[in-house]
From Swiss-Prot:
InterPro entries associated with the record: PdxA, PdxA_fam
Major localization listed first in the record, in broad terms: cytoplasm
Single annotated GO MF: metal ion binding
Cofactor binding: number and manner: Binds 1 divalent metal cation per subunit. Can use ions such as Zn(2+), Mg(2+) or Co(2+).
Pathway annotation: Cofactor biosynthesis; pyridoxine 5'-phosphate biosynthesis; pyridoxine 5'-phosphate from D-erythrose 4-phosphate: step 4/5
Binding-site positions, a divalent metal cation: 173, 218, 274
EC numbers: 1.1.1.262
Domain of life: Bacteria
Protein name per the record: 4-hydroxythreonine-4-phosphate dehydrogenase
Additional notes on this entry: The active site is located at the dimer interface.
Annotated GO biological process: pyridoxal phosphate biosynthetic process; pyridoxine biosynthetic process
Lineage, opening ranks: Bacteria, Pseudomonadati, Thermodesulfobacteriota, Syntrophobacteria, Syntrophobacterales
Length: 345
């Protein structure tokens, strides 16, 4: 890849959902082509149908692999790789089938393989419906865990990132009642380390400020409302001092921490569980938050919304999250492949 713009594999997600629609809308303008060369991994007929719906005049350029693409293919064509063929009757808005769910898996597997082989610099994944996928044999809680298995990664951290707020999660898709037992010093150290490394290497921050949220109300109030802050969170944070390039502080009461981070006091927050971290970021970045997988050997971002079957084919799906996800993948790829691996806590 000699082009200065990184190639980003863009998986379609569920072709029966809004994935094709938001891709068609996002790629109808030249904006994304200015920061990267997007390569859609998905179904050509689904994309063409969505392009017609959006009024896009671009043509789909079907490839077998990224290596077939010229260094500068221009912005008048949308490169696409179709790892599996689907019939027209398989792709009905809002009605996923065993065939389409199987195709979704192939899209992800192919994009990851291209990234591991160096044929693309990053992967941006479209929305999938985990419940429908599970009905048809998908045995992972979600994208993040599947990517962890495909890349053989020991630990992957889920981050939601917006222009004013970034949040990593210590635990992801877990019942709230199970969260306290899942937290331990070594696990939290690793989550903090992976987040700190990504802030430097992928986000390009020279001296990031990372804050850790408490688990309990008022961060436990010195043990009155729980001892996790005393026995787990503080030891994990203290073990990372003296700090390296990243300053790590906390644990802070979560009810005020996110406002402080949003105001610019911190560059990112480590939250203890799913809704603690995702409620505030979706409140302020509902249309432009990006799901980022940290700790992988590849760059991976994703839209921060689902398949929205009720909007598929209506032209009302909003492409903002997809546009932001591709732009962030391009930025992360540029930073990662231009930089030397950082030394972090």
């Amino acid at each position: 890849m000699s082009s200065s713009k990184p190639r980003i594999a863009l998986t379609m997600g569920d072709p029966c959902g809004v994935g094709p629609d938001v891709i068609a809308q996002a790629l109808a303008s030249p904006t994304l082509f200015e920061c990267c060369t997007p390569i859609v991994v998905g179904d050509p007929s689904a994309l063409q149908r969505s392009m017609a719906l959006s009024g896009a005049s671009k043509k789909v350029l079907v490839l077998r692999e990224p290596a077939e693409l010229p260094d500068d293919p221009g912005s008048d064509r949308i490169p696409l790789i179709a790892p599996v063929e689907l019939s027209g009757r398989d792709i009905e808005h809002g009605r996923p089938t065993a065939a389409t769910c199987g195709a979704v898996v192939r899209y992800i597997e192919s994009a990851v393989a291209f990234a591991l082989a160096g044929q693309v610099r990053g992967v941006c994944t479209g929305p999938i419906n985990k419940a429908r996928m599970h009905e048809h044999g998908f045995d992972f809680p979600g994208h993040t865990e599947f990517l962890q298995a495909l890349t053989g990664s020991r630990r992957v951290v889920m981050m939601l990132a917006g222009p004013r707020l970034r949040v990593s999660l210590a635990t992801i898709h877990e019942a709230l009642a199970d969260v306290p037992a899942l937290l331990n010093v070594e696990m939290l150290r690793e989550v903090i380390r992976i987040t700190a490394e990504a802030l430097i290497r992928d986000f390009g921050l020279q001296a990031p400020r990372l804050a850790v949220a408490g688990l309990n109300p008022h961060a436990g109030e010195e043990g009155r409302f729980g001892r996790e802050e005393i026995e787990i969170l503080r030891p994990a944070i203290e073990s990372l001092r003296p700090p390296g390039r990243c300053t790590v502080t906390g644990p802070y009461p979560a009810d005020t921490l996110f406002q402080r981070a949003h105001a610019g006091e911190f560059d990112a927050v480590v939250a203890m569980y799913h809704d603690q971290g995702l409620v505030p970021i979706k409140l302020v970045h509902f249309y432009d938050a990006v799901n980022v997988s940290l700790g992988l050997p590849i760059v991976r971002t994703s839209v921060d919304h689902g398949t929205a079957y009720d909007l598929a084919g209506t032209g009302r799906a909003h492409p903002g999250s997809l546009t932001a996800a591709v732009q962030l993948a391009a930025l992360m790829a540029h930073n990662r492949f231009a930089a030397v691996s950082p030394v972090v806590p």
